[in-house]
Regions:
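Active-site-proximal beta-strand elements of phosphoester/diester hydrolases
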Residues: 1-10, 92, 96-107, 133
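N-terminal, active-site-proximal structural segment of metallo-dependent hydrolase catalytic domains
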Residues: 1-47, 62-63
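Catalytic metal-binding/acid-base residues of hydrolase active sites
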Residues: 9, 34, 104-106, 136-139, ...
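Active-site neighborhood of phospho(di)ester-bond hydrolases with catalytic His/Asp-centered motifs
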Residues: 28-32, 54-55, 131-135, 161-165
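Structured beta-strand-rich core segments of catalytic domains in phosphoester-bond hydrolases
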Residues: 32-105
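Active site of divalent-metal-dependent phosphoester/diester hydrolases
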Residues: 51-70, 140-198, 202-212
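Acidic/histidine-rich, metal-coordinating catalytic segments
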Residues: 128-142
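Surface polyanion/phosphate-binding segment centered on an Asp-His-Pro turn
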Residues: 208-222
Length: 222
């Protein structure tokens, strides 16, 4: 099973291009979708055989997460919303025996509650068939508080950081803003539990290099 994550930055990427650069994954998780782009991706991906598995949204939030899948979801209670800070920004589902948790963290001073909500879930799922993927808005090398905290939880709870063996090593980054003062950062991450020992990460910078988003895509092969 292949799972693609991409922060679209509210852009409407041609779905054929999305699938080609994303190497035709089985499951697609997209972040930062306005209502218009939600309709764009739902229609375009439906024609390619993907079902919009997410609950309906009645209002527009820039960090909406949406899950599109060619594979059947194994649970009816698919998604959880965890408090105001992660409402609509944390979705969980189970596909082919794997729990997929997709996250889009807030920025700056709004991270404390969301990270504290992630901690107990991470502690329970580290020994399981679980994938945690998304835009954490946290570069471990540049965020002095939450970067080390995230990596500490990953290590303490038995998760594996898929960046450790990904192409590009420590020099790879996933985000570069448009302002001159913006530094390249690795803020998109993928972690797997102990029962997914063969999982690997493929970094897809073409989304960023071609101007389709200012984020790279992450493709996890399970």
């Amino acid at each position: 099973m292949k799972v693609l994550f991409l922060n679209t930055r509210k852009k409407r990427i041609d779905c054929g291009t999305l699938l080609r650069i994303g190497r035709r994954p089985d499951v697609i998780v997209l972040a930062e979708l306005l209502q218009g782009s939600q309709r764009h991706y739902e229609a375009g991906l439906a024609s390619a055989g993907y079902e919009n598995c997410s609950q309906a949204a009645f209002h527009s939030r820039k960090r909406h997460l949406r899950v599109y899948s060619k594979l059947k979801l194994e649970t009816d209670t698919r998604f959880s919303r965890q408090g105001n800070k992660l409402q609509n920004n944390w979705v969980r589902c189970r596909i082919k025996g794997v729990t997929i948790s997709a996250v889009h963290m807030p920025t700056l001073g709004m991270k404390r509650k969301p990270f504290n909500q992630l901690k107990p879930w991470m502690s329970k799922q580290g020994a399981c068939r679980a994938l945690m993927i998304g835009d954490f808005n946290t570069d471990p090398a540049q965020d002095p508080k939450w970067g080390p905290q995230l990596i500490e939880w990953v290590n303490d709870f038995g998760w594996r950081n898929l960046w450790d063996k990904a192409s590009g090593g420590t020099k790879a980054y996933t985000f570069k803003g448009t302002r001159k003062s913006d530094k390249p950062r690795r803020i998109d991450h993928a972690f797997v539990g102990k029962r997914l020992p063969k999982a690997r990460l493929i970094h897809l910078p073409a989304f960023r290099l071609k101007g389709l988003s200012d984020h790279s895509g992450l493709l996890v092969v399970l």
